[in-house]
């Protein structure tokens, strides 16, 4: 497996790659029952938030969006993606005070079901940390799914956060790492 990094409004002019990204973006937002557990396996979104059209917008450029793609070495198939961008957030602390922050945010993270639980997501996440020269605690997470919470707990030990009205999760360790 290799990881390709594309920065907005980067070149997604390879038709097969663009089609694969659009397909995975739709899968990422769709709720399907898992045959093994009979529970929802995606993010319960009303529409996809990752597509080649959205990646080509001025908003994607303004947010410095990056798309990390896990590519199968054997057949070139896109196995998963991780989309990030910088967002200006108002963080509400437990005392009711707001702080303005501009973290790199995990905006969408999806590995195709056939490739899940094989280390693909972990490799994407580690490559993100390497590319951005950051730590998991220094990131914000846009509406993380239960699967992403479990992933972060298992692989990097992030669990403590104060719920935000904007549904972004900024872990308490974000502020501890800046002290």
Curated annotation (Swiss-Prot):
Acetyl-CoA binds at residues 109-122, 145-154. It holds the Pfam family Acetyltransf_16. InterPro entries: Acyl_CoA_acyltransferase, Atat, GNAT_ATAT. Coiled coil: none annotated. The keyword Transmembrane helix does not apply. One of its GO terms (cellular component) is microtubule. The keyword Oxidoreductase does not apply. CDD domains: NAT_SF (cd04301). HAMAP family: mec17. Specifically acetylates 'Lys-40' in alpha-tubulin on the lumenal side of microtubules. Promotes microtubule destabilization and accelerates microtubule dynamics; this activity may be independent of acetylation activity. Acetylates alpha-tubulin with a slow enzymatic rate, due to a catalytic site that is not optimized for acetyl transfer. Enters the microtubule through each end and diffuses quickly throughout the lumen of microtubules. This is Alpha-tubulin N-acetyltransferase. It comes from Phytophthora infestans (strain T30-4) (Potato late blight agent). The lineage of its organism: Eukaryota, Sar, Stramenopiles, Oomycota, Peronosporales.
